[in-house]
UniProtKB/Swiss-Prot annotation:
Entries under Pfam families matching the protein: CN_hydrolase, Vanin_C
Protein name in the entry: Pantetheinase
Reactions performed catalytically: (R)-pantetheine + H2O = cysteamine + (R)-pantothenate
Tissue expression summary: Widely expressed with higher expression in spleen, kidney and blood. Overexpressed in lesional psoriatic skin.
PANTHER family on file: BIOTINIDASE-RELATED, PANTETHEINASE
Source organism of this protein record: Homo sapiens (Human)
């Protein structure tokens, strides 16, 4: 015979559990200037590898301690923060540890060597325990295999780019193997199936993924759509790509588009355009850092709602499909944005209404500039196609952007500064997806928190005049279901393919990704 829990006991337990939960929490992210290994593909000894990792951990320890002293409940550190990059499979191996499944119920700080030599995990565990703070870190996992596994690599092991989470008692509570490896990241293996990793705290439910994962459906969208996490923790080593994929720009837009908190911790390496960390709420950025001028790390802290209220679902095509095309009479022209061919129309005058279309996507813009600055040109652009450079992903993008120069051929080139402020803007598009990420980026890679919002009918519009000159106002849409559709044509031009080999390949080789 089964027994049921008395109703009054169940109700009591419910209220006790609610009382033990926090409505808000303090989050920290640390942008780390990693100490890198020597540029050699010859494996070093385990002792040399540990020496380098401990130098980086010494710096991370300072950030973790400082965050805890300021009341942080959780801190996120970057991808590659502990050992850097410049590896092949063999040269990475001395830096790896066997990271067990968190179900083993293990506090490495209390039970050393339970799973072999694991000094990095032990140190991270002790940092979490001794400071009573959740610690999110990125390290490398190794898993032996043999011929009984038909997918076993020739060297007899799997190597994974891995995120780990230790709770405030030092317990290993999450392990995530990166699914979407960046081009050239061949020192690692892809897990056989995408891993959906969550962990629960008294200040909300969390999901975790890494860097390039953010551009794909799994695990990123699944964590929010199906597992309903409150907050994403995001270790990354992100190279900024303007105009649409600057770290602070895109990560804050993803938080707003998916309506979750987002804790992004980036490597600080300005010579490779790697900077940009932030703490983002669904309605606005709370703290962010972008610094191309110094070589120093940066700790950010901010308070967030543990369970952010979910705003109304946006119908991204509602407004745009209800209005007629806003004919400007201006001639359309083509321009390349990160190797994709956009259709543009030049903005003329201090105010106006414009429409530009490509394939199934029509973009509508209404705007008013604070003043017309003669040596600056802005354009409205549309792209509806498959991006195939460093990855394969289908995009629909509506963008108002500053051209690099007054030459229209530079519309879409990377522009980092501007002088034109806008009194108002309203941007919308006939998107074929519910996954649209709203971006507003000001001059010198600054965000505009509290200056814009998205309406339920799909308009990205200003709430006040911009506080700084505008680089871009963008609706960045992803059609995940078309990433591998046979009829999806690439937006990459033949000229862009040549440029890709010239520009992208050396960067990848220099990072050994």
């Amino acid at each position: 015979m089964t027994t049921q829990l008395p109703a009054y006991v169940a109700i009591l337990l419910f209220y006790v559990s609610r009382a033990s939960c926090q409505d808000t929490f303090t989050a920290a992210v640390y942008e780390h200037a990693a100490i890198l290994p020597n540029a050699t593909l010859t494996p070093v000894s385990r002792e040399e590898a540990l020496a380098l990792m401990n130098r980086n951990l010494d710096i991370l320890e300072g950030a973790i301690t400082s965050a805890a002293d300021q009341g942080a409940h959780i801190i996120v550190t970057p991808e590659d923060a502990i050992y850097g990059w410049n590896f092949n499979r063999d040269s990475l191996y001395p830096y790896l540890e066997d990271i067990p499944d968190p179900e083993v119920n293990w506090i490495p700080c209390n039970n050393r060597n339970r799973f072999g030599q694991t000094p990095v995990q032990e140190r991270l565990s002790c940092l979490a325990k001794n400071n009573s703070i959740y610690v999110v870190a990125n390290i490398g996992d190794k898993k032996p295999c043999d011929t009984s596994d038909p997918q076993c690599p020739p060297d007899g092991r799997y190597q994974y780019n891995t995120d780990v989470v230790f709770d405030s008692q030092g317990k290993l509570v999450a392990r995530y193997h990166k699914q979407n490896l960046f081009m050239g990241e061949n020192q690692f293996n892809v897990p056989k199936e995408p891993e959906i990793v969550t962990f629960n705290t008294t200040f909300g439910s969390f999901g975790i993924f890494t860097c390039f994962d953010i551009l794909f459906h799994d695990p990123a969208v699944t964590l929010v759509k199906d597992f309903h996490v409150d907050t994403i923790v995001f270790p990354t080593a992100w190279m900024n790509v303007l105009p649409h994929l600057s770290a602070v720009e895109f990560h804050s837009a993803w938080a707003m588009g998916m309506r979750v908190n987002f804790l992004a911790s980036n490597i600080h390496y300005p010579s490779k355009k790697m900077t940009g960390s932030g703490i983002y709420a669904p309605n606005s950025s709370r703290a962010f850092h972008y610094d191309m001028k110094t070589e120093e790390g940066k700790l950010l802290l901010s308070q967030l709602d543990s369970h952010p209220s979910h705003s109304a679902v946006v119908n991204w095509t509602s407004y745009a499909s209800s209005i007629e095309a806003l004919s400007s009479g201006n001639k359309e022209f083509k321009g390349t944005v990160f190797f994709d061919e956009f259709t543009f129309v030049k903005l003329t005058g201090v105010a106006g209404n414009y429409t530009v279309c490509q394939k199934d996507l029509c973009c509508h813009l209404s705007y008013k500039m604070s003043e017309n600055i003669p040596n600056e040109v802005y354009a409205l652009g549309a792209f509806d196609g498959l991006h195939t450079v460093e990855g394969r992903y289908y995009l629909q993008i509506c963008t108002l952007l500053k051209c690099k120069t007054t030459n229209l051929n530079t519309c879409g080139d990377s522009a980092e500064t501007a002088s034109t402020r806008f009194e108002m803007f309203s941007l919308s598009g006939t998107f074929g997806t519910q996954y649209v990420f709203p971006e507003v980026l000001l001059s010198e890679n600054q965000l505009a928190p509290g200056e814009f919002q998205v309406s339920t009918d799909g308009r990205l519009f200003s709430l006040k005049p911009t506080s700084g000159p505008v680089l871009t106002v963008t609706l960045f849409g992803r059609l995940y279901e078309k990433d591998w559709a046979s009829n999806a044509s690439s937006g990459l031009t033949a000229q862009a393919r040549i440029i890709m080999l010239i520009v992208i390949a050396p960067i990848v080789c220099s990072l050994s990704w």
